[in-house]
Structure formats: C-alpha cells, structure tokens
UniProtKB/Swiss-Prot annotation:
It comes from Thermoplasma acidophilum (strain ATCC 25905 / DSM 1728 / JCM 9062 / NBRC 15155 / AMRC-C165). This is 2,3-bisphosphoglycerate-dependent phosphoglycerate mutase. SMART domains: PGAM. Pathway: Carbohydrate degradation; glycolysis; pyruvate from D-glyceraldehyde 3-phosphate: step 3/5. Its EC number is 5.4.2.11. One of its GO terms (molecular function) is phosphoglycerate mutase activity.
Length: 200
C-alpha cells in the first residue's frame, strides 16, 4: 500500500503579499495559516499515518510540524518536495506575468521565458518522492508540486491543468499504486475516504 496525502502549506506572509519564492526562506505562516494547519491535523485524526515529510521551505515545514505534533511524530525534509524552480520569477509577484484576462498560475510559453523548472522535471521528482514509501504518508509541499502530481496521474500537462487551484492547507489524497485520486484539494476527510484508507 502506498497512499500519499499531499497537503499544501498554510497561508504565509508572502502569500498575502502575492510574492513568489522557491528558496529556503524565513517567511512565516500567518495566524490564519497556523489555524489552517491545525484544522488539517484535526481532519487527519484517526488515520494511521506512518510518517510526515516536508519541503525544506519554512512555510511548508512549519505547517508539517504543527500537523505532525498532533501525532507525536517528527517531520523529515525531502528536497524533492521543494517549490517549483521559479527562475527569473523568484521574488516577484505572479500578477506581473499574466495578460490581464486570467489570474493564478504562470502558464504556457512564459514559463520558458522565465527559465522556470520544466513541468516534467517537477512531476518526476514529486512522484518519485511519494512512490518511494510504503504505508499512508503525509507530504507537505506547495501548490505547483501538488498540481504536478495530480497532472501526472491524470496524464495531463501543465497547461491542461491550469484550472486546478490548490488552496492553502488543502489535502489531495492519492493511491499511488493504482494511480487513483481520492480527493483533490479537499479541506475535510470524508467518511468514504476514511473507509478506503482503513481497509487498505
């Protein structure tokens, strides 16, 4: 059994400012972000989680720590869970790179112009991380790495999954062995998902 519970970090101060960052920084969770992490921890109660893994970036690690503390477990950092390489977009605002019609992800050819990490590279490292461990494990990471994992199992590219918006502290559950996506950016663990996890 290989079940991955992918959780985006809670709201951070740079989320509020709209700034992009892929570095191991000192950006903090907001008070709201900490409450979001506590909510995720409460939703995971009763699930037999083996281990907790996190991107080394502070906003993700702090989220993972809040959740893992409620299970009396440690957090292990995994470089493969780090934010997408942002290239020339690092430290800038995402809305600088949209055409005014749409907001959200940086998409299409502009990603190449900004020398961002290639989507297939991001997919490869994230999927390797979640496929390498047995049991039910939690992986706290960032929006694009989660979107990349989802797009991998849906056999889609970056542009085909532009509309996927992974909210702060939301949970995406994937049965990695069979490629089944059980939740997509959920904020609660439903009875049907709990039942599935408990019978694996």
């Amino acid at each position: 059994m290989k079940i991955a519970i992918l959780i985006r970090h809670g709201e951070s101060d740079i989320n509020v400012k709209g700034i992009l960052s892929d570095t191991i920084d000192n950006n903090m969770l907001t008070e709201k972000g900490m409450r979001q992490a506590e909510h995720a921890a409460a939703e995971l109660k009763g699930i037999d989680i083996k281990n907790f893994y996190s991107s080394p970036i502070k906003r993700a690690f702090d989220t993972a720590q809040i959740i893992a503390d409620s299970f009396n477990k440690d957090v292990v950092t995994d470089q493969r869970l780090i934010e997408i390489g942002l290239g020339k977009a690092r430290g800038r605002k995402a809305n600088e790179f949209t055409n005014g019609l749409y907001s959200g992800h940086i998409t299409g050819k502009i990603r190449e112009d900004l020398e961002m990490e290639k989507w297939d590279s991001l997919q490869k490292r994230v999927v390797e991380a979640i496929a390498s461990r047995e049991g039910i494990n939690v992986y706290v990471t960032h929006s694009d790495p989660i979107r990349a994992a989802i797009s991998y199992f849906l056999e889609m590219g970056e542009e085909e999954t532009y509309g996927l918006s992974i909210k702060n502290a939301s949970m995406t559950v994937i049965d990695v062995e069979i490629g089944r996506i059980l939740t997509l950016g959920a904020i609660s663990m439903t009875d049907s998902v709990r039942k599935y996890l408990n019978i694996q």
